[in-house]
């Protein structure tokens, strides 16, 4: 077990002790060790706990990526969190919601970097973030049809009378 995995597992244990079954089992089989938040409503509380707890200090959200799970009819996010200046460890946290009208609570008030990342996940996947301060498109025009990174996305033929070349 690498030092990175040991540190991530220790961080997971602190979160699991506080939140119990709201989080899944720890997994280190991917590039970055991760766990999943199973109780989506607790995501902001878990995020705040991870940022502020003295043994965790995850003070930096390096990335928040949207994911489409069409076979499960779910959308999700993967947040790469780091304790930059304090402890030097990192972990990924996954959160999923229903593909059809589900939402994930925003953590833009916990990590300011989440603001634009959540907007991008909304723009590309149609993922809703409840409580987001400014949830609107960030890359596509406001009147763009659909969400380009969903696996079932069909490119519109024209946009304002201009042929879309794909």
Swiss-Prot record:
Keywords: Cell inner membrane, Cell membrane, Membrane, NAD, Quinone, Translocase, Transport. Its EC number is 7.1.1.-. Its main location: membrane. One of its GO terms (cellular component) is plasma membrane. InterPro entries: NADH_DH_suC (IPR010218), NADH_quin_OxRdtase_su_C/D-like (IPR037232), NADH_UbQ_OxRdtase_30kDa_su (IPR001268), NADH_UbQ_OxRdtase_CS (IPR020396). Pfam families: Complex1_30kDa. It is an enzyme of class 7 (translocase). One of its GO terms (molecular function) is NADH:ubiquinone reductase (non-electrogenic) activity. Gene3D superfamilies: NADH:ubiquinone oxidoreductase, 30kDa subunit. It catalyses: a quinone + NADH + 5 H(+)(in) = a quinol + NAD(+) + 4 H(+)(out). It is found in: Cell inner membrane. It comes from the Bacteria. It is a peripheral membrane protein. NDH-1 is composed of 14 different subunits. Subunits NuoB, C, D, E, F, and G constitute the peripheral sector of the complex. NDH-1 shuttles electrons from NADH, via FMN and iron-sulfur (Fe-S) centers, to quinones in the respiratory chain. The immediate electron acceptor for the enzyme in this species is believed to be a menaquinone. Couples the redox reaction to proton translocation (for every two electrons transferred, four hydrogen ions are translocated across the cytoplasmic membrane), and thus conserves the redox energy in a proton gradient. Belongs to the complex I 30 kDa subunit family. This is NADH-quinone oxidoreductase subunit C. It comes from Chlorobium phaeobacteroides (strain DSM 266 / SMG 266 / 2430). The lineage of its organism: Bacteria, Pseudomonadati, Chlorobiota, Chlorobiia, Chlorobiales.
């Amino acid at each position: 077990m690498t030092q990175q995995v040991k540190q991530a597992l220790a961080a997971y244990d602190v979160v699991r002790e506080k939140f119990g079954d709201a989080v899944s089992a720890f997994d280190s089989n991917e590039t970055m060790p991760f766990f999943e938040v199973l109780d989506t409503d607790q995501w902001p509380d878990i995020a705040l706990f991870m940022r502020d707890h003295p043994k965790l200090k995850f003070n930096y959200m390096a990335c928040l990526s949207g994911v489409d799970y069409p076979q499960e009819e779910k959308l999700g996010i993967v947040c790469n969190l780091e304790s930059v200046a304090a402890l030097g460890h990192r972990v990924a946290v996954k959160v999923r919601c229903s593909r059809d009208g589900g939402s994930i609570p925003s953590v833009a008030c916990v990590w300011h970097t989440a603001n634009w990342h959540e907007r991008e996940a909304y723009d590309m996947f149609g993922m809703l973030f409840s409580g987001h301060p400014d949830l609107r498109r960030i890359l596509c025009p406001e009147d763009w049809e659909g969400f380009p990174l969903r696996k079932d996305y069909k490119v519109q033929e024209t946009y304002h009378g201009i042929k879309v070349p794909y």
